[in-house]
């Protein structure tokens, strides 16, 4: 009787070690441990089907880009010229970078002046600080024109 009892735990231990080894392998992969937790509750393959349904509920994350606006400006300036996807990606990154710099500078200015709100004045000052010379002057005039048009409409 005792040898049989020893064989059963010995047989169970390797079986228990294999899922532990699989868990160790799957843990760095991200969402794999969550799927493994669902398997015993969902009883096998049905659990993996539920994982797919959960994926459908979340849907795709929308990525906001400036691509359509870049294209519209390009067509206003040069109607006959196109743009490659790589160039579009570079332009999108450029606009995101400038936006982050202006937002950061505007936030600093608001903090320095102990104001809780970023207004057009902070944006205008940050444009003058971030952009060089003539570019800053043109950006300020275009920005002022856009704000005036927005408030009058």
Curated annotation (Swiss-Prot):
There is a cross-link at residue 149 (Glycyl lysine isopeptide (Lys-Gly) (interchain with G-Cter in ubiquitin)). It comes from the Eukaryota. SUPFAM superfamilies: Histone-fold. GO terms for molecular function: DNA binding; protein heterodimerization activity; structural constituent of chromatin. It is found in: Nucleus; Chromosome. Can be acetylated to form H2BK6ac and H2BK33ac. Monoubiquitinated by BRE1 to form H2BK143ub1 and deubiquitinated by UBP26. Required for heterochromatic histone H3 di- and trimethylation at H3K4me. May give a specific tag for epigenetic transcriptional activation. Keywords: Acetylation, Chromosome, DNA-binding, Isopeptide bond, Nucleosome core, Nucleus, Ubl conjugation. PROSITE patterns: HISTONE_H2B. Residues 1-60 are annotated as: Disordered. SMART domains: H2B (SM00427). Residues 1-28, 36-53 have a biased composition (Basic and acidic residues). GO terms for cellular component: nucleosome; nucleus. The modification N6-acetyllysine is found at residues 7, 37. Core component of nucleosome. Nucleosomes wrap and compact DNA into chromatin, limiting DNA accessibility to the cellular machineries which require DNA as a template. Histones thereby play a central role in transcription regulation, DNA repair, DNA replication and chromosomal stability. DNA accessibility is regulated via a complex set of post-translational modifications of histones, also called histone code, and nucleosome remodeling. The nucleosome is a histone octamer containing two molecules each of H2A, H2B, H3 and H4 assembled in one H3-H4 heterotetramer and two H2A-H2B heterodimers. The octamer wraps approximately 147 bp of DNA. Belongs to the histone H2B family. PANTHER family: HISTONE H2B (PTHR23428). This is Histone H2B.7.
């Amino acid at each position: 009787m005792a040898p049989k009892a020893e064989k059963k735990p010995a047989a169970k231990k390797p079986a228990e070690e294999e899922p532990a080894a699989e868990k160790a392998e799957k843990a760095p992969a991200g969402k794999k441990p969550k799927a493994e937790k669902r398997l015993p509750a969902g009883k096998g393959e049905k659990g993996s089907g539920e994982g797919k349904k959960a994926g459908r509920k979340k849907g795709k994350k929308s990525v906001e880009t400036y691509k359509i606006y870049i294209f519209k400006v390009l067509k206003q300036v040069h109607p006959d010229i196109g743009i490659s996807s790589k160039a579009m990606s570079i332009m999108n990154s450029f606009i995101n970078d400038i936006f982050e710099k202006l937002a950061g500078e505007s936030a600093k200015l608001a903090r320095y002046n102990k104001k809780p709100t970023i207004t057009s004045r902070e944006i205008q000052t940050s444009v003058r600080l971030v952009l060089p010379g003539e570019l800053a002057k043109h950006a300020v005039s275009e920005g002022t024109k856009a704000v005036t048009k927005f408030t009058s409409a």
